[in-house]
UniProtKB/Swiss-Prot annotation:
Binding positions for (6S)-5,6,7,8-tetrahydrofolate per the UniProt entry: S112, L113, L114, P115
Gene3D superfamilies: Formyl transferase, C-terminal domain (3.10.25.10), Formyl transferase, N-terminal domain (3.40.50.170)
Species assigned in the record: Rhodospirillum centenum (strain ATCC 51521 / SW)
UniProt keyword annotation of Flavoprotein present: no
GO cellular component labels: cytosol
Function in brief: Attaches a formyl group to the free amino group of methionyl-tRNA(fMet). The formyl group appears to play a dual role in the initiator identity of N-formylmethionyl-tRNA by promoting its recognition by IF2 and preventing the misappropriation of this tRNA by the elongation apparatus.
GO molecular function, a single term: methionyl-tRNA formyltransferase activity
Keyword terms of this UniProt record: Protein biosynthesis, Transferase
Family indicated by similarity: Belongs to the Fmt family.
Protein name, entry field: Methionyl-tRNA formyltransferase
Any matching Pfam family: Formyl_trans_N
InterPro entries reported for this sequence: Fmt (IPR005794), Formyl_trans_C (IPR005793), Formyl_trans_C_sf (IPR037022), Formyl_transf_N (IPR002376), Formyl_transf_N_sf (IPR036477), Formyl_transferase-like_C_sf (IPR011034), GART_AS (IPR001555), Met-tRNA-FMT_C (IPR044135)
EC id: 2.1.2.9
């Protein structure tokens, strides 16, 4: 079977294994679309996206328009003569003329089991909500937000200690496997899209920096999910009695009882509204991350003392 003529549209690290899978599956990836270079690092130099760098390494032409709403950009896209466009965390809205241009349409790799967690942050919201399973949905795109009919789905379990980065990586690899299978099925005419169920729709709102603040009046299980969901970004923190903003990079829920925000015996353990949270790795402003024992050596407070401002 002859390979398909494709464009790939993606931007962050999540999308790179998917591009690699397409390039290695015998398809012709004739163009990659990604977001424009952004200032990054201490020098705020313009940096190309991870997908941009990978596409250049693969020798694939790269386009990075700020928008696809203009007639010129849409005409350039249509002129590619695509069988299909594969989209994975691109970050730009695709207008209807773009969605309609490829022969087989635009196919999205979405990091949830639709219709649960439509939207911008499905990985983090699944962990935050305490879901036991996540997954990837390969769907045909339409104008609505992640509302299109589904082609393939694959599950990925969320364990009690799974963090956002580990789930991100597992879903990216799952997406890479599923998109190859989906394209094979589409090319052979043996794959039929199914409408999403009307029940079970939830939305994964975009992450905000202020969501990282830890409120120890909440129960420990909720705070544990918050740390696992929001590390590395937006990151979790609390205001310590020293006046510093202390980052929490890793934690675990444990048994314990006390006034919320006070220290309990057993490492850097903080009482919560219900249970306690042991802070395994923390970071003071401008300092390297340390484990709880190392932090306590510089913060000699006995159990019962308040650590949270």
């Amino acid at each position: 079977m002859a390979g398909l003529t494709l464009a790939f549209m993606g931007t962050p690290d999540f999308s790179v294994p998917i591009l690699d899978a397409l390039a290695g599956a015998g398809h012709r990836v004739v163009c990659v679309y990604t977001q424009p270079p952004r200032p990054a690092g201490r020098g705020h130099q313009l940096q190309p996206s991870p997908v941009h760098r990978r596409a250049e390494a693969l020798g694939i032409p790269v386009r990075h328009p700020k928008s696809l709403r203009g007639a010129e950009a849409q005409a350039e896209f249509a002129a590619l003569g695509l069988d299909c466009a594969v989209v994975a965390a691109y970050g730009l809205i695709l207008p209807q003329p773009v969605l309609d241009a490829p022969r087989l349409g635009c196919i999205n790799v979405h990091a949830s089991l639709l219709p649960r967690w439509r939207g911008a942050a499905p990985i983090q919201r699944a962990i935050q909500a305490g879901d036991a399973v996540s997954g990837v949905t390969i769907m045909r795109m339409e104008a609505g937000l992640d509302t299109g009919p589904m082609l393939l789905k694959g599950e990925v379990p969320i364990g009690p200690r799974t963090g956002a980065q580990a789930l991100h990586d597992a879903l990216s690899e799952q997406g890479a496997r599923l998109i190859v299978a989906a394209l094979d099925g589409l090319a052979a005419g043996r794959l039929t899209a199914e409408p999403q169920p009307e029940e079970g729709v939830t939305y994964a709102a975009k992450l905000a920096k202020e969501e990282g603040r830890l409120d120890f009046a909440l129960d420990a299980a909720t705070l544990d999910r918050q740390v696992r969901a929001f590390t590395p970004w937006p990151g979790c923190w609390f205001e310590a009695v020293t006046g510093e903003r202390l980052k929490v990079l890793a934690a675990e829920p444990v048994s314990g009882r006390g006034e919320p925000g006070t220290l309990l015996p057993g490492g850097l353990t903080v009482a919560c509204g219900e249970g306690a949270l042991r802070l395994l790795t923390v970071q003071r402003p401008g300092k390297a991350p340390v484990d709880g024992a190392a932090f306590l050596r510089g913060f000699p407070h006995a159990p019962g003392a308040r650590i949270v401002a």
